[in-house]
Amino acid sequence: MDNQTPSELIDAKLAGLGDWRGATLARLRALIHEADPEVAESVKWRKVSNPLGVPVWEHSGIICTGEVYRDKVKLTFACGASLGDPNGLFNASLDGNTRRAIDIPEGGSIDAEAFKALIREAVALNMVKKQPKR
């Protein structure tokens, strides 16, 4: 398992779920790649209780993480509080100063175009934050 690439680890996590959560996270993953073909996948926070870790999508910093719970799939945006979210996709972690999240329950859906726009906005924010200070 340690010789696997991050993308292979994410593939294994999705395959191992084998239910609606895996299908939902796979769809969100595809939308992230559609929105930003240069996105890099990584896996963070691997531990005994979660050996495949948490999928992370990055471009000039973390865009979002994909967490799986019994009753939902959660996409947490690292700098979500700084994003406009004109379509109101954020529905969790709304009180924090930094992060925002989208919880998708079984049978739930997401507006694909609005989600891709949110991904592109997060990438643009990361790129501005990475510019050297003068």
Question: Model regions: which residues?
Answer:
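Charge-dense, helix-prone N-terminal extensions
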Residues: 1-134
